[in-house]
């Protein structure tokens, strides 16, 4: 009975919109209003389609070993990048795959949280329901917003977008979100905007042979002087990129920017030409941010550590994220997150 009722509701809404289009065409000048009308119609029809797909979606997942605690003991954080209609390579995920990921998580009982809720949980100041998790996106790519938002909307989910502010606010790119789009995202109530650096999301030359390494974790080769940066020059370059992005986004949105996603997931923990890079970065993060995010890939199976309460932490919290890409299977993703819920320190 319930499914028949839903189908009747969908059909009724479709008829209402059809009548609206006919009436609008009779009384309004479509040369002025057609774009807004058709965008609204397309948006609502897509929403109806997604709701119908969700109603019939099914996935069999393993939740037999999950914790039975009344409250969340760990919080899993996912990170996506671009969401093109068809994904060609890492780290992109297709719109269809993303939809299946979120449908499966919703069907499995998972609900999203905000950055504020995550911070309170990590500090031990707040309890969250079991199966709470956070969705994040890096880079501020247009497809991440346009293809994710309709799915977030029908599931009543929210997400965080980490923006490279110099690419979005200082340029009018066809690839990165612009300022108007970012404000539109915030206005939906489904998106939080945070920092992914100013322009430091690129590789820099580290020697006179043209070898390159990530911006944040290495000293830059100064060709003019035929040498590497000094310690102070490195510090000032990183300080500028971090503070510029935080201040630029904060001023633009009139909101506090208190979270940062590490570009290239590299803070000198793997390979660097400056052994003190990670210490300097940690000091700057403690100065400017409450939460700092980095990617984490499980080495084998489901053996990975999620994010736990840490009341003794005195600086920025390092938040581990599960990196999602073109190869991430829907069932294995849900099984991974389910497995993390059962692990205790």
List the model feature ranges, each with a label:
Residues 149-156, 177-195, 282-286, 307-314:
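Acidic (Asp/Glu)-rich catalytic clusters
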Residues 17-29:
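Hydrophobic alpha-helical membrane-insertion segments, chiefly the h-region
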Residues 158-178:
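A short, conserved beta-to-alpha structural element at the edge of catalytic cores
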Residues 27-136, 143, 205-345:
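C-terminal active-site subregion of NodB/CE4 polysaccharide deacetylases
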Residues 78-83, 164, 195-199:
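Short loop/turn segments at strand-loop or loop-helix junctions that form parts
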Residues 1-17:
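N-terminal Sec-pathway targeting helices
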Residues 137-140, 197:
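Active-site metal-binding loops of divalent metal-dependent hydrolases
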Residues 177-219:
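Active-site cradle of extracellular carbohydrate-active enzymes
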């Amino acid at each position: 009975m319930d499914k028949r009722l839903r189908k009747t509701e969908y059909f009724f809404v479709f008829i209402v919109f059809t009548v609206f289009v006919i009436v609008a065409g009779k009384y309004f000048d479509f040369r002025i209003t057609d774009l807004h009308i058709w965008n609204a119609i397309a948006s609502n029809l897509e929403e109806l389609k997604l709701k119908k797909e969700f109603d019939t979606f099914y996935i069999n997942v393993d939740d037999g070993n999950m914790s039975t605690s009344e409250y969340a003991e760990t919080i899993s954080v996912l990170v996506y990048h671009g969401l093109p209609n068809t994904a060609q390579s890492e780290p992109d995920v297709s719109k269809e795959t993303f939809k299946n990921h979120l449908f499966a998580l919703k069907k499995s009982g998972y609900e999203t949280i905000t950055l504020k809720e995550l911070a309170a949980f990590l500090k031990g100041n707040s309890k969250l329901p079991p199966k709470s998790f956070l969705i994040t996106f890096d880079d501020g790519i247009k497809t991440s917003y346009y293809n994710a938002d309709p799915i977030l909307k029908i599931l009543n989910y929210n997400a965080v977008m980490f923006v490279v502010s110099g690419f979005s606010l200082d340029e009018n790119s066809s690839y990165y979100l612009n300022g108007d789009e970012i404000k539109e995202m915030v206005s939906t109530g489904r998106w939080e905007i945070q920092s992914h650096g100013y322009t430091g999301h690129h590789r820099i030359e580290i020697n006179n042979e043209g070898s390159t390494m990530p911006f944040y974790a290495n000293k830059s080769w100064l060709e003019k002087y035929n040498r590497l940066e000094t310690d102070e020059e490195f510090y000032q370059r990183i300080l500028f990129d971090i503070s510029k992005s935080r201040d630029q986004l904060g001023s633009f949105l009139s909101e506090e920017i208190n979270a940062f996603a590490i570009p290239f997931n590299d803070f000198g923990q793997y390979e660097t030409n400056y052994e003190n890079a990670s210490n300097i970065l940690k000091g700057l993060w403690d100065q400017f941010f409450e939460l700092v995010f980095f990617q984490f890939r499980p080495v084998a199976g489901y053996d990975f550590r999620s994010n736990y309460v840490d009341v003794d932490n005195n600086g920025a919290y390092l938040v581990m994220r599960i990196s999602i890409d073109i190869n991430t299977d829907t069932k294995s993703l849900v099984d991974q997150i389910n497995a993390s819920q059962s692990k205790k320190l």
